[in-house]
């Protein structure tokens, strides 16, 4: 039987006959007709997880608070008092809506100074 003959035979089937055919194929080959739809949904979820903007959040200043305050001033351009207040009131966002590269750079500087940082 050629592909064209199979397609012609399928075209002539009723909905009930097509349903039975699908069930028979699923049982014969151990597959489900719903699997491709589920796989497409999972792939769509993976695309949504791909973020383009990140927030860098200072979770803790750690033991060397002075170094962290200096790093925060350098990163944000804040004055000494504002940077100290931000560090004292952690967890606080340091940078919001930045690229992945910038977020990793900021995270590296803060962790180097002794801070605990989270990128969201």
From Swiss-Prot:
GO terms for biological process: translation. Keywords: Ribonucleoprotein, Ribosomal protein. Signal peptide: none annotated. It comes from the Bacteria. Residues 95-112 have a biased composition (Basic and acidic residues). GO terms for cellular component: cytosolic large ribosomal subunit. InterPro entries: Ribosomal_bL12, Ribosomal_bL12_C, Ribosomal_bL12_C/ClpS-like, Ribosomal_bL12_oligo, Ribosomal_bL12_oligo_N_sf. One of its GO terms (molecular function) is structural constituent of ribosome. Residues 95-120 are annotated as: Disordered. Pfam families: Ribosomal_L12 (PF00542), Ribosomal_L12_N (PF16320). HAMAP family: Ribosomal_bL12. Belongs to the bacterial ribosomal protein bL12 family. Forms part of the ribosomal stalk which helps the ribosome interact with GTP-bound translation factors. Is thus essential for accurate translation. Homodimer. Part of the ribosomal stalk of the 50S ribosomal subunit. Forms a multimeric L10(L12)X complex, where L10 forms an elongated spine to which 2 to 4 L12 dimers bind in a sequential fashion. Binds GTP-bound translation factors. This is Large ribosomal subunit protein bL12. The gene is rplL.
